[in-house]
Amino acid sequence: ADAINAKWGSVAAFKEALHTQDVDGFEIICKFDSDIILSKDYLQMIADSFAKNADYGLVGGLLYVEKNGEWVYEGNSNKKHVRGPMKAYRKECFLQIGGLRETLGWDNIDAILLQNLGWKEIVLPELQVKLIKVKGADYTIKPADYYGRYFYFLGLNRFLTYVAAAKEAMKIKSAFFLFEIISCYEKCKSLNLELKISKEEQKIINQHRWDLFKNKWFKM
């Protein structure tokens, strides 16, 4: 649970620091974790991409980890999603989505909401960000509890949660893993744990996930 809470603990630290600044004096708002290394031209290339593209709302590079002495792509997500450790927002976009949420799934909630408002989430593949991993850690492996809580706090309905849970269970070919995810999700619902998103935002997120599901399985 501590590891899961740490996922959005960086958001709390970011918001605490942001409150000390007058955002009116900035055009770009960045959230960077302390365990990453940026290239010397990273910030300039981010600024240039915003300046040249008025519809860019969120921009970032690709995350790399050291493996056997080489830096390789940390393939824990698709290459069109800006990962949590290295977010750069156009200020107007950041304010429109209401900032970041201190909850599991925050780094997907922001992307879905900004795209719904017409902004683009852009990954610049030429920008390599080095993640300093804890020795022996494998960030691609997550427990069932993580997924159950993640789907709940993302605001997903039961149908989409069960579909997503089945997808994760199939990856490791475990029916028990599916049962564990669903059990955790249902426990969160029964406890009526507080969500950091509004009812309207839940609808937006569910519609987004439903559209992805339809496009993949029905080609509609």
Tell where the protein language model's regions lie, with residue ranges.
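Short, high-confidence coil segments that cap the C-terminus of an alpha-helix
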Residues: 26, 53-56, 119
